[in-house]
Amino acid sequence: MNPKLVIFALATCVAGLSQALANPQVQMGIYSPASGGNYRANPNAELEWVLSNYVTGKSTDGTYFGTFCIEKNEYFSNGGTYDVVLNNKAISGGVSSPTAGYDVISKGTAFLYTQFATGMLSASYYGSAANAAKLQDLIWWLEGEQTSWGAGTYNSLLLAEFGANWQVDARADYTGSAVKVMNLTSNQGRTQNQDQLVYVGVPDGGTTAMMLGLGLLGIALANRKSRRG
C-alpha cells in the first residue's frame, strides 16, 4: 500500500470530520408523539449523523429526535433554529449552575437518556406526553434544577441501576462520551438558549472514520518496515 495514498485518505477523513462539525444546528420544537421526547430537535446536515443512533418509531421519526432540556431558566422558541456546540455540561444557565459557569450532567441523566434513545424504556412510554413530562421532571431533579421529581416510575430504573444509594450516586458527574449536551445559542453566539441532550453513541460522529484512517496508516507503515527488514 502506498503510504502517500494512505496519508491522503487520512487527511480527507479529518477534513471531512472538520467540515461535518463546522456549523451544526438544530431546529427545536415542542413535544411530538412521533419523535418520542419531551422536545424534538431537527438537526441540519452537519448534525444529522446522530439520527442513526436513535430508534425509529420510538426516539426518532427519522427527521427529528426526541430530547430533554437540562436548564429550567433558559428557553427556546418553538420552530427556532439554534447553533450547537457538543459538550458534556450545561453552560452558564441553569438553576444549579455553579460559580464556574458550567454544570456537568449527571450519571443518572446520561443513563435515562440512553435508555430513551436506544428504545429500552417500556413500550407504554413512547408516544405519551404524560410519561415524557415525568421523565423530564426526573432529569431536572438529577440536574439540580428542582427539589423533587413528579409522580412516576422512572426513579425505579435509577434504583435498579445505581442501588439503594441512587439518590446520591445517580447525581454524580457523568464521565462517559455516549451522551452529550447540545449547548444552544442564537444571535451569533450572543444569546444562550436552553441546553438539550443528544445521544451520539460510542464512538461519536466522525471518530470511526478517523480510527479507520489511523489504522490503515499503521498497517501501511508496518508493511513498509517489514519490506525494509
Q: Where do the protein language model's features map onto the residues?
A:
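Sec-dependent, cleavable N-terminal signal peptides
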Residues: 1-22
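N-terminal hydrophobic alpha-helix used for membrane targeting or insertion
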Residues: 8, 125, 202, 212-213
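Helix-centric, low-specificity signal for extended rod-like, repetitive segments
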Residues: 12, 127-129, 217-218
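Short, charged juxtamembrane terminal tails flanking transmembrane helices
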Residues: 226-229
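A detector of low-complexity, intrinsically disordered, Ser/Thr/Gly/Pro/Ala-rich segments
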Residues: 5, 10, 61, 79, ...
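A short, hydrophobic C-terminal helix/tail in secreted or cell-surface proteins
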Residues: 203-223
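Short, surface-exposed polybasic-aromatic patches that bind anionic ligands, especially phosphate groups
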Residues: 23-200
